[in-house]
Amino acid sequence: MSKNIQRQRSISSISSRGVDRDRDPASGGLGLLSPYNSRSPLAGLHHSPGSLDATANQLSRPTFLLERKATEDIAKLDGVLFDDIPTLGSSNDHISSLGAGSPYPTINTSLAVTNPNYLSASSPGGPRRRANTASGPLSPAPPASPIDRLSKTTNRGSFVPSTARQPMNSQPPAPASSAPPPKQRTTSPSVASPPSQTRSQTVPYLSSNFGPTANMYGQRQPSGVDPSRPFHQVPLPPPPMSPPPAIGTINSIMTNIPPPPPRYPSAPAAAIHLPGPPGAPPPSGLPPPPGPPPNNTTNWQGTWIGAYGSYIPPPPPQQTHRPYNPQPYKTVNGQTIAIPPPPPPTESMQMSATYIPQGDSYGEGVGIPGLGMDDMAAWSATSQSSWLGGYNSIGSLAPTNASDTAASTPVDAYGSHNRDNSTTSNATSSGASGIPPELAAQWPLDRVLDWLQANNFSNDWRSTFRALDLHGNRFLEVGSANGGRGNFGMMHQLVYPRLAAECISSGTGWDQPREREEGKRMRRLIRHIVKGETPGTGMSSHTRKESISNTSLVPTSAGPDSGSPDTPIKAPGPGFSVGHPGGNHRKLLVGNFDDEGAHRRSPVASEPSEVGITFTERSSSNRGYSPAGSPAPTPGLFSSSTAPNLASSPGGRFGGHRNRNSTDSVSSNAAIYGSGVPPDASQVLRSQMNFGDMAKDTRRYGHDGGNRPSPLGDNASNGDRSAGASEPPGSAKEGKSFLSIFNHRKKKHHDDPDSPTSPMQHKSHSLGSRGNASETSLERPGSSVSTSHEHNTPASSMRSRRITTGRIFILATLDYWNYRMVDVSDVESASDLRQLICINLGLPDADGAQVYLTELGKFDHEDPLDDSQLVANKKVRADAAGSLKVFVRPGNMAGLAVNIGQSQNALSPAHLPAGAKMDEDTYARLNGQRRRSSSSPPASRQNTLTGGEHGKPTSTGADDDENKDPKSDDIAQQAEAHRIEMERKQQAYLAKRKHARENGNSPSENGTGSYTGIVGPKVIDFDEPRNSPFEDKKPFDSAFAPQRRAPAAPLDPSATLIKANSLSKRGSHQRNSQGSVDGFPSKRQGTGMTESPKHISEKRKPTNERQALGGIGAALAGMGRGLGGIAHPGGAGQRGTSPNRSSPGSAGESAGVASSTTDRGEDAKSRKPISSGNVSPTSSARTVSDEPPQLPKVVIKPRIFDGDSSSDEDSDDDSDDGLFAKPLAGRGGDDAAAKGKEPATKPVAKSPMSKHGTFWNDADSDGDEDPISESASNLNKRPSLTVNTKRGRKGLSVTFTSPDLPSSAGSKTAAGDEDDRSSRGSKRTPNTPHSEGWDSNNDKDVKLSRRKSFMEKDTSIWANRPPTDALINNLEDFFPNLDVDQPVLEEGELPGDLPPSPIAEAEEPHDQQQAKSMTTSRISNLYNDSDTLGSDESTLKALERPASIVSVARKNTRRSGGLGRMKSIREVAHKRYTQGAGAPPPVPAAPNNSNNSSSSGSKNSNLMRRKSTKMFNANIVQIRPERGSMILPQIPQDHLPSLPHNANNQIPKRQTTFRWFKGQLIGKGTYGRVYLGMNATTGEFLAVKEVEVNPKAAGGDKNKMKELVAALDQEIDTMQHLDHVNIVQYLGCERKETSISIFLEYIPGGSIGSCLRKHGKFEESVVSSLTRQTLSGLAYLHREGILHRDLKADNILLDVDGTAKISDFGISKKTDNIYGNDKTNSMQGSVFWMAPEVIRSQGEGYSAKVDIWSLGCVVLEMFAGRRPWSKDEAVGAIYKIANGETPPIPEEVSAAVTPVALSFMWDCFSVNPEERPTATKLLAEHPFCVFRDDYDFDQTELYAKIKGTWNTK
């Protein structure tokens, strides 16, 4: 292994623990890995002449070592140092102790041996170790050796360095590079290795050409842990002696290094910061920036930098700089500017944050960019420690230059700052903060401790500072390092850990948030100390000599400039920063990331050509121009242009770099502590996004929103300001996350604002930001070109506010209509709050503005809020939702005149109050006669400028004052003329409408049908009829042509007036039924809102000519679908319109096509939306069909009837309860209607439809006749219509009826028929049985009690689940919300044709074909695809079932050859449960015999229950009627007609969809309710257990609710695959977000517990049978590994045929060892049925034998008729059970039952579970469970009690 590689590894392994080797006097500057160290593993290695001095061979290395220090002390070195690196001499004891190290070496001037290789570097893990001081406090300087004298005379012209030591206090130090090798070489070393070489393969020598005054060549970054090295000012480096060679290596630039100037006069003679090596002088003659050392063969550059993860700074630009020419910048705004920009870097000077090594880089890893190449002369993005920031960032002190002040000229500024303009973006590498050593010397430890006490810091803080010895420079850097942010590394690595220990030791306790706030306060106070301020005053401006790193170049303002319309200064290059005023400006990034005044350009927005060109060029280059031609604002007037000026990234706090496309500052510092930047900011900027992309501003670039100057200030984002302040700013509109950085930050004001006409106020953009007028530009305020202005608001406090709390908004308005959202999160004082509100509202001045509390719609304000009230309301009422709303009445605004002297904000169009009277005038005045219409949203304005053409720069300052008044007067005159013209047009428009109305509602001249009734704001005249605005009047020749739309409104206004309120309460998306007259024009205005209360919406044009037909013709429109007849089931497709919803004059369905309902009756293909040009902005979008409907092919002779007018009086109550109470057969007054009697006086269901002759079909009668018998004769009857033109009363322009049908032929009048049909044909809101609104207002005889659960109708009913026969014959009772006779299922799609389920468990009857051939009154021949139920517009469209389309096509195919066959719910259920001849069910059927429960019918029902279809893993969909209707949508069936069936006539397997209907409530439990359900696919009845998580139980936490729902899955998973005759079968489940529906097998009857409570105890034979069945089910469960754990009489269902079934597995548990004690079993179950081991488990668990104990309790319960432990309460029972007592058997039970029964109970009550028998053993061996052949449940007393419970007729 070569020596060089060894040496490289030596450097790479330098210690990072930060312990200064100065502390070890014996270190001697030798590293443990030095080949000259006898204790080093490298000792004895051969050293080539390339690294050793050949002339020093006279001396032996060990001798020299022994002369300096004891050899045995070398081992005490904490780290490893390269031995031949010179250490700093007697002048290094005041080097700053902070910083991450410098890429430049230091030299030991005290060594007697001259060796150019004595360089020191730090390890990758931490700060570079310090060089040993020769005369410092830790070690004396060694005496001079003969090598010094030798090197003075050897090889003068070669690269042998000079060894002359110069006293630091007398003259600049010589670059003594002592080297003590055994021999010294006399030949010049070769040039440094090429870039491809690994780092530190060669160590460059120092050239002796520099003479005795040459020093080492780099700045030095002080350590963060060295208290002995206070910060020191850097002297000015001399100009270079010669240009560097154009070689892309590290040595190419290291030539002609001059001696440094004298050190700082007052500095101690211990430490000095050596300036960086200069580069080639720019052609302009400006002083050069620092460069790397000259051609030295020492290889510290490559190794050092990589050693601690930093980057070497690039050299200054090598290209020819553009000479300074201030003229283009002077003429931008017609005025001169104080400071023009310096020459910019070229585009080649670009390096991104992710450095990609090029051919000229060298070193390990990604390498270090080569120095000296022209193409590398770029602003370093990854290392802002560039030549611009040499002094500030790396630690070299700024030179003492009298001209280097804030008032220096641009040349002076550049000359003094071009070497120190940038800093690194890393906190660890942004070292020196420019603290004068005199100031540091004023803060010894005692004063620091006293200062802490004086500022109310706790004793823990004082102890911490005392223990850490924080004083002087280290103390001041805590708050002022890193661009004013403070030294976070020290705070988090030293101070906070020590403070935590102190707090714990002192007993006060470590409160991290509190101490962090204290730390922020401390840093803020220290920053004030460094700035020379008091905390309460504005920070003093600091000159560049003392400036922190990020205020490097730009001259800052002479004083604070709060409130002044400054122009932000665009710095010309990296490190150049701009000052910014404090007042009334928002900043995009939190605290600007640079609260000390150094704003940087965004890495993304800064394009390569942005620097050094004139403002005109910049504003039009790259992204500077708005693509839509949005005019660039006047640079002097608005401190912004259209370029997307991104915020400076967090690195801005560490230095003002403006590297184009550089993202290192954000990517590396976005999420650092206290930066206030959301974590995703780094990723956003890394992906080259600008804030316009992030905010997704729809108004960007001007053409869809407009970039106008904002009322929030010169720099406010124009994209989120609107002309009327009617929209919230972007910071408010956008969400949290990264966009929260758009927040407004209110800065404190300063007392000395510049004059509005001050030359420092209106500066051109020569140095200004070019982007702040962009669509999402930085919200950072502009700055005048003067001293960098510091904000009062500390950055730390701003960051803490931004991080800790959410934003608070208030809504402010000037005109009651448009509200501006104002972010008041950080505003505390009333004056600031008023100022902020006024700024957001565009008021130039908050003086005199009065603030009132307001609410939406409030127009009167009396008492303004004083300051205390304003602050109190803000604290109490303001929140993130903007609950606090204020109205602001401007104070001294004379006619909205703009006071330029106050603020340039007033010149923004968005500055004006929205909705003000002179909004048009003001906008025209501000936009050069450009007006905006009243309908145009304010936010749609582009970025327009004041008083000039778009994009044309105008003068500012006093010139604006001179030009403003004549212009304003002219604009005001024009605005007044415009207003008069608008009023004239409005009057003409209203007159035209009035004239059209008086002329018989004829269309207006422009073809728009007139409409009236709107008088003033929202005054609607319902008594004045009008034509629909959507109709075209056309001749009456096509009056009888069929139309899809309903006829025009009748002249009778009563229905409209009566139902207006009722229908206005309805939703806006209800479906129109086809049988209704649903499109009548209404007098109601559309739901859309007009722009102004005084303006009518724009004129509407007709959309459909066919709608112009008059009353009779229009009435024919929907008749084809509305006719009743045999072939059309009773209102199947036409029953959708409720009587009190679809009256011809229904006001809710306004204006024909303007109906607010969705036209579900139209085929989607036959409708097209109205063009936007024909619809008023206020009218909702509606669809109109231009295609006439298909007329019915079947015509039936009708009879005419006049609608019953018995219900002329109606109320506006929209409840339709009682309208549809269908009479049941065999009940009181209902029989009369069923028998054909005409109850003439019986009140008809209140409905305006009956008044206007609305038809109803009578296809599904309730009569006793069998509809089949008359089906043939009914087929010959064709429905038709006759028109009665004699209008005997209002509203009867059209009357129609349906032909006589079996149930009503000759027996019912039309009115009676209508009443009967309304019982189930009308729309009904499907309320649950116990929901509100069930009570009916109808007659008591008509009203039924089915509004409640049928289990409550008769208290004599023991069971709550009727047999299936009773269900079939009383379906309308149990499904009250459905029309059970509506044909919704095609016969071919019923289970008879295709298996509805993958599990085709039930065999289909062979006589299906007979049923198919039969036609009844329920067959529909008019049920076509244009109907609601047949179209995809139905509610099933949401299911996206392709089968729906297939079903329609199949029906159409079938319809072309004949009539289709539709089945109703009643038929499906009857077919499922009746295995008879396939005849349609009687409606109602004749009463069965009393023994039907035990007859074959009962057995068939039981058989069908056993074949219940399981629906697990299938798609389960609940079918609900449309809201407000009983009509079901069409049910697309699961069939694949396009796929051929196989030989077995089976369809391919796929996921089946089961659809079910929800019926009555049949049970309630602790955890949910049980409803009757029906599987529409199979016709099976279901018990649907709905368990809904109570939000209160979950505390309103949705996640917790979901967890509770997930817990319910246990029951389903447990029972999914179980199948036993004595267990309730689980058929499926439907999971929802907060509820779950479990589908169970429907078991008629009730629970054993309910039967016991009703009928008393059971006889022993019944108990034995039920016990045997329960035990059989229990044994099955145990075999399956399931513990029931809640077995009791209430959880065992008793069927009406005597079958027992175990149910309720809610707390069941599945286990592998059913009879082994499971310790995880907890106390579950019901107390009185619990086994002893459950109560006293004590961690031992229990087994399935707990169910045996519970079964014994159930047996005792059946014998006694009451629960066990009936005389004890729960607590007492628990106590007794835990003590081993068994449930007492009452004496009457003991005397009545047999000993076998007693022995069974005693066996079950075995206290020891080991002695308790298992279920299988009891079932097989116990005599009580023996099956008895003579047992017949039908012959028992229990059956005699319950046999008459349900009448199945």
UniProtKB/Swiss-Prot annotation:
Catalytic activity entry: L-seryl-[protein] + ATP = O-phospho-L-seryl-[protein] + ADP + H(+); L-threonyl-[protein] + ATP = O-phospho-L-threonyl-[protein] + ADP + H(+)
Pfam families: Pkinase
Name of the protein in its database record: Mitogen-activated protein kinase kinase kinase mkh1
InterPro entries: Kinase-like_dom_sf, MAP_kinase_kinase_kinase, Prot_kinase_dom, Protein_kinase_ATP_BS, Ser/Thr_kinase_AS
EC class name: transferase
Active site: D1686
EC number of the protein: 2.7.11.24
Gene disruption: observed consequences: Does not affect significantly the growth rate but produces fewer conidia. Inhibits significantly hyphal growth upon high osmotic stresses and in the presence of cell wall stress agents such as Congo red, calcofluor white or SDS. Accumulates chitin at the hyphal tips. Leads also to a looser distribution of spacers.
Gene behind this protein: mkh1
Organism of this sequence: Cytospora mali (Apple Valsa canker fungus)
Any single biological process term in GO: MAPK cascade
Residue span(s) of domain Protein kinase: 1556-1825
Molecular function in Gene Ontology: ATP binding; protein kinase activity
